[in-house]
A protein has these predicted regions:
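FNR/FR-type flavoprotein reductase catalytic core
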Residues: 66-173
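Ferredoxin-reductase
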Residues: 1-78
């Protein structure tokens, strides 16, 4: 279990993945923590790809939020509850065919798209994948360096990503 603070408000966190958990890239699960003996659960899109051994989530801290204010301070050894039933229709099989796939996200809405841009099928089905990520401030462009640099060097998808993924980080202030 680890937490990455992108800004004081934006953070991502990773946890080990139960090998029995199967999901389709773009889906979400319900996650949470036990608080005062009861589970406190919320739906979160999965940011990691379905072939990775960990689960990654991207969140914003909601002031006095019943769950996000706790998730931001997770430490190794803390127990994160993860539902066994992923769901959601933001998946490739539900998209109409076409030459270009446009992915528009603001803030933490980037999470399911992170999963999709790691999916080999995305690049098989579309000639171009255009990812637009809008935020208020430059420092809120979480994953920017990863998308611009590291992802293009992906061991298996690097060539496809360099050729087909177009990334437009957008800042409004």
């Amino acid at each position: 279990l680890s937490v990455h603070l992108w800004t004081p408000d934006y953070f991502s966190f990773r946890t080990t993945r139960d090998q029995a958990l199967r999901f389709v890239n773009g889906q979400f699960v319900t996650i949470g923590l036990e608080v005062e003996g009861r589970p406190r659960m919320r739906a979160y899109s999965i940011a990691s790809a379905n072939y990775e051994e960990h689960l990654e989530f991207f969140s914003i801290k909601v002031p006095n939020g019943p769950l996000t204010s706790l998730l931001q301070h997770l430490k190794p050894g803390d127990k994160l509850l993860v539902s066994k039933k992923p769901t959601g229709t933001l998946v490739l099989r539900d998209l109409k065919p076409g030459k270009r796939l446009f992915l528009f996200a603001t803030g933490t809405g980037l999470a399911p798209f992170m999963s999709l841009i790691h999916d080999p099928e995305t690049y098989e089905r579309f000639e171009k994948v255009i990812l637009i990520h809008g935020v208020r401030w430059t420092n809120e462009l979480a994953y920017h360096d990863y998308i611009e640099q590291d992802l293009k060097e992906h061991e298996y998808l690097g060539d496809e990503i360099r050729d087909k993924l177009i990334y437009y980080p957008t800042v409004t202030r």
